[in-house]
UniProtKB/Swiss-Prot annotation:
Putative solute transporter. This is Solute carrier family 35 member F5. Belongs to the SLC35F solute transporter family. Its main location: membrane. The gene is Slc35f5. The chain crosses the membrane at residues 69-89, 101-121, 244-264, 269-289, 297-317, 328-348, 362-382, 396-416, 421-441, 453-473. It is found in: Membrane. The lineage of its organism: Eukaryota, Metazoa, Chordata, Craniata, Vertebrata. It comes from the Eukaryota.
Length: 524
């Protein structure tokens, strides 16, 4: 009996193996080892898992958007509580130390504390010491577009090259030569059980798919690591953040200075109500300079803002005659601050579309630095013009300013900007309306202020306009007012339906004979 030959080369017809029937651990098919096939299959399964996860992430984007909206609303509610407490503390400070410019300058300069992140936070130091964006950005330049395509594109076009057919030379393989030396005594060839093609088809991927070929050789954890690197690379550098902070430093300072001037002239409740008019300016600016779908202009949003403005007018009319002059000046400062706040949030959201691209603490840190370096000459200007005499506060007032600056400015502004990124610029500005009931309660309890019925009549529509706009943005810019207007217009201007008369059937002709079609169906 002739022993079965040891077959370790290519799968030539007639070759047998000494391994068990299912022991394919070292088998070779058409010049490809089974280990290579198994490794390629495992890699392909890993990449398929990546594609499936990307599809799942794209399908769950609606759920994540709702979570972002809910988190943003909670953050804005917390900011409202902090702002009301900060406003009451500021109002108390102004009774003993009425220096709005000094208070604003001191609070804004405290943003410099965020720059301590360059000492504590290692990624910030890497951006300055090693040029963090250099090598990874060049190495994974095309990968960002690849991951974006995985989540947005629904079909991958197979743009392979034209097929090239090359004959397979089984006898030229080194394994075949080794086989011929070991089993040269065999003279009777066995009947072929597996027939292989003598021609192999070769297709080449285009250069645009080179990244996919590279990723197919990477494990799933490695792909996830590179994806996290891409997110880090997508962040703005320290230089870019500093440039943005330099521009918004002046706008932010003017907005806060206007708010502080208003607090020094009138009650906290009136200031907060008038400051909520920033929703009108935000709606107009966001319609002109939209940053996302949540900033789209709708008729329902316009009516909600008009409702808020109507309430503001009633609140302004509720002021007493004794303090009418100061209330008017405070109202003007409040409206100016509302306008600057709208410019600030709309422009920064247009400049930075996602919150993960901007390091918010770094942004505010540079804002405080530029404020400290560039705006100190304002003390001399206001002192010599007589608008605000420079005077250093006492220890109690200084302690109140420091506490108010750390919590009411440094922390609250960070949370507010984060909440605006999670929701929309309009919701972020209209969130100021929620300070109305809290400030009313605080003024009535702490300062014993009595408000007229006009004040409450105006506070209610301003308060509810925030919830109206939130619902409209939550339901994908739902515009019920426009829908109602269209239905009313269609009801009024509807046309009578054209009724067919018997003579119309004579003028109708079927292009396809229904009788012939039915006969063909019956025949089949």
């Amino acid at each position: 009996m002739v022993p079965p030959r040891l077959h370790r080369g290519a799968g030539r017809p007639g070759g047998l193996s000494s391994l068990p029937p299912f022991g394919l651990g070292s088998a070779r098919f058409a010049g490809i080892a089974f280990e290579d096939l198994r490794e390629a299959l495992a890699t392909r399964l890993q990449m398929v898992y990546v594609f499936i996860m990307n599809r799942v992430n794209s399908q769950s984007s609606g759920f994540s958007q709702r979570r972002r909206m809910a988190l943003g609303i909670v953050i804005l509610l917390l900011v409202d509580v902090i702002w009301v407490a900060s406003s009451e503390l500021t109002s108390y400070v102004f009774t003993q130390y009425n220096k709005p410019f000094f208070s604003t300058f001191a609070k804004t300069s405290m943003f410099v504390l965020y720059l301590l992140g360059f000492i504590i936070w290692k990624p910030w130091r890497q951006q300055c010491t090693r040029g963090f964006r250099g090598k990874p950005a060049a190495f994974f330049a095309d990968a960002e577009g690849y991951f974006a395509a995985c989540t947005t594109d629904t079909s991958m076009s197979s743009s392979l090259s034209e097929p090239l057919y090359v004959p397979v030379k089984f006898h030229d393989l080194p394994s075949e030569k080794l086989e011929s030396t070991n089993i040269g005594t065999e003279k009777t060839p066995k009947k072929s059980r597996v027939r292989f093609s003598n021609i192999m088809e070769i297709r080449q991927l285009p250069s645009s798919h080179a990244l996919e070929a590279k990723l197919s050789r990477m494990s799933y954890p490695t792909v996830k690591d590179q994806e996290s690197i891409l997110k880090t690379v997508g962040k703005l550098t320290a230089t870019q953040v500093a440039k943005i902070s330099f521009f918004f430093c002046f706008v932010w300072f003017l907005a806060n200075l206007s708010y502080q001037e208003a607090l020094s002239d009138t009650q906290v409740a009136i200031v907060n109500i008038l400051s909520s008019t920033s929703g009108l300016f935000t709606l107009i600016l966001a319609a002109v300079f939209p940053s996302n779908s949540g900033d789209r202009f709708t008729l329902s949003k316009l009516l909600a803002v008009i409702l808020s403005i109507g309430g503001v007018v009633l609140v302004n009319l509720s002021g007493s005659e004794k303090s009418a002059g100061r209330d008017t000046i405070g109202s003007i400062w409040s409206l100016a601050g509302a306008m600057f706040y709208a410019v600030y949030i709309v422009m920064i959201k247009r400049k930075v579309d996602r919150e993960d691209k901007l390091d918010i603490p770094m942004f505010f840190g540079f804002v405080g630095l530029f404020n400290l370096l560039l705006l100190w000459p304002g003390f001399f200007l206001l002192h010599y013009t007589g608008f605000e005499d420079f005077e250093f506060p006492n220890k109690v007032v200084l302690l109140c300013i420091i506490i108010n600056g750390l919590i009411g400015t440094v922390l609250s502004e960070f949370l507010w900007l984060w909440g605006c990124f999670l929701t929309s610029s309009l919701i972020g500005t209209l969130a100021l309306s929620l300070t109305i009931p809290l400030s009313i309660i605080a003024d009535m309890c702490m300062q014993k202020v009595q408000f007229s019925w006009l004040f409450f009549a105006g506070a209610i529509p301003v308060f509810f306009s925030f919830f109206i706009v939130t619902l409209l943005c939550h339901y994908n810019n739902w515009d019920p007012v426009m829908v109602g207007v269209r239905r009313v217009f269609a009801f009024i201007c509807r046309k009578h339906r054209i009724q067919r008369v018997p003579e119309d059937s004579e003028q109708c002709e079927s292009l396809i004979s229904m009788h012939s079609v039915s006969q063909e169906d019956g025949a089949t």
